[in-house]
Amino acid sequence: MLYRSALRASRSFTPRLASTNSRLVSSLVFLEHKAGKLNEASLSAVTAAKTLGNDTHGLLVGTKSEIENVLDRTKEIKDLSKIYLATSDTYSHSLAEPLASLLASIASAKDVSHIFAAHTAVGKNIFPRLAGLLDTSLIADIIALESSGDTFTRPIYAGNAVLTIKSSPKDSVKVVTVRSTAFDKAAVANGSAAVEDVDIITVDTPTQFVSEELTVSSRPDLASAARVVSGGRALKSKESFDTILDPLADSLGAAVGASRAAVDAGYADNSLQVGQTGKVVAPELYVAIGISGAIQHLAGMKESKMIIAINKDPDAPIFQVADVGLVADLFESVPQLVKEIDNVKV
């Protein structure tokens, strides 16, 4: 594996933070939520933050009704000692500019040493801006960190190498996104976090919310599902993708995923893509159907606890990481597998 350390050069500009005589003693976790539910990936970010041994605080933002829907459960998170609330319509759609300014303000006012978020679409949108406002490095997609708080590990080259990063002492606030599959979820039980309101920060921004289209599915969320069934280009068409994968996913209670080749061919929506440029998953069970196993796809699923691969090519790279491999025609074997599963369930 490749290891490399990097120290940033000193800067001529110092961000407006708490007094240099103040002791930076707490970590802050940005807690995502949507439609009245806390994003499970944020619980992994809490676990990462707790590694440092500091007081760990959470931040909930949104309208009054949005916060009320998730506050009770959030207070139950065992590893949080305090929850900051920023209640305003300004934060109702998670626009990056106002949220980055809010986080920067809290970092200055609350003696924060580290700010964490899950490495999700929301985190990846907000945290680069936050790092810019604080004139600090963004440390993205970490899979480990040391209790010292200045050394982090992240994958590079599609997961084929690991980079060790030592942040500069000039970065008095560390801005970090966390790969959720690399950390256990913080327990949501017996917590007793205190609640504190924070000031709303108003910023002028050219970005305005226009609309949002959400895909409604009865299946588990792909990023956090315990079981995932993914299909590749070998399914040959969108119709086959749906008719072959959906029954198996329904039988297993699984989420549906897709390789980049299947997405590019129009078989599946981009939101289902698993891989280096898609979602990174680590379910208990991952079933790869008609997926050859390109390195970009493996980067998004190789940490799965159990991998089952079905492919008619015995030399397909996917078999090198699979725990169970079946060399067979997917159009025959998958329907038969569904029948067997349903028979067992009966």
From Swiss-Prot:
UniProt-annotated location(s): Mitochondrion matrix
Pfam name, any one = ETF
Q: Which cofactor does it need?
A: FAD
Cofactor binding mode, per the note? Binds 1 FAD per dimer.
The record's Gene Ontology cellular component field reads: mitochondrial matrix; mitochondrion
Task: Please cite one Gene Ontology biological process associated with this protein.
Answer: fatty acid beta-oxidation using acyl-CoA dehydrogenase
Binding positions for FAD per the UniProt entry: 285-313
Q: Which UniProt keywords apply?
A: Electron transport, FAD, Flavoprotein, Mitochondrion, Transit peptide, Transport
- Role summary: The electron transfer flavoprotein serves as a specific electron acceptor for several dehydrogenases, including five acyl-CoA dehydrogenases, glutaryl-CoA and sarcosine dehydrogenase. It transfers the electrons to the main mitochondrial respiratory chain via ETF-ubiquinone oxidoreductase (ETF dehydrogenase).
Say which family it is in: Belongs to the ETF alpha-subunit/FixB family.
Relate the assembly described in the record. Answer: Heterodimer of an alpha and a beta subunit.
This chain's protein is named: Probable electron transfer flavoprotein subunit alpha, mitochondrial
Q: Which organism is it from?
A: Cryptococcus neoformans var. neoformans serotype D (strain JEC21 / ATCC MYA-565) (Filobasidiella neoformans)
